[in-house]
A protein has these predicted regions:
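Active-site-proximal helix/loop segments of hydrolytic enzymes
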Residues: 2-157
Length: 157
């Protein structure tokens, strides 16, 4: 989902954020290295953008939609607001915000989430994710989640 990552980078930059991408080409980057990159950058948040799929034998008509995963408890608030924005922007089934022992987030110390915008095993969701409109919606959802999360940390007057 590099296209979504690039669009999110542009949206965040326009909003005044400093963005460090752990991957800018289709070549894979080791999951542990992604955490190291985020720590070295002193990132305030880490978001890993994905599309979900299931192994053989899992019913895709039961398991489909958007999902946000976290490893560390301090990531729950970011996950919850991002998941809500994903549902609003993409309009897919809510698979929740859930703990999972995800390698990409274990080595981070900032709020870290992994988003699964849709399921590529579902032909309609896969086709939609290939369109610029839905890619923009996915990026916008993550932007909204980050904005909501950081706004919640601001001191009240």
């Amino acid at each position: 989902m590099l296209q979504v990552g690039f669009r999110l980078r542009d949206l965040l930059t326009q909003a005044g954020a400093n963005v460090v991408m752990t991957r800018t080409t289709p070549d894979p980057v080791d999951l542990g290295l992604r955490a190291i990159i985020s720590r070295r950058a002193n990132a305030h948040a880490f978001v890993s953008i994905h599309l979900n799929a299931f192994p053989d034998g899992v019913n895709p008509f039961v398991n489909n939609g958007s999902l946000t995963l976290y490893f560390w408890p301090q990531s729950i608030p970011l996950g919850v607001v991002t998941q809500a924005a994903l549902l609003d922007e993409l309009g897919l089934r809510d698979n929740g915000t859930k703990y999972q022992n995800i390698a990409v987030a274990r080595g981070t110390w900032m709020p870290s989430i992994l988003t699964e915008g849709a399921f590529v095993i579902m032909p309609d969701q896969e086709a939609a994710m290939r369109t610029p409109t839905i890619q923009e919606a996915y990026a916008t959802a993550i932007l909204r989640g980050l904005q909501s999360y950081f706004a919640s940390l601001a001191p009240t007057p």
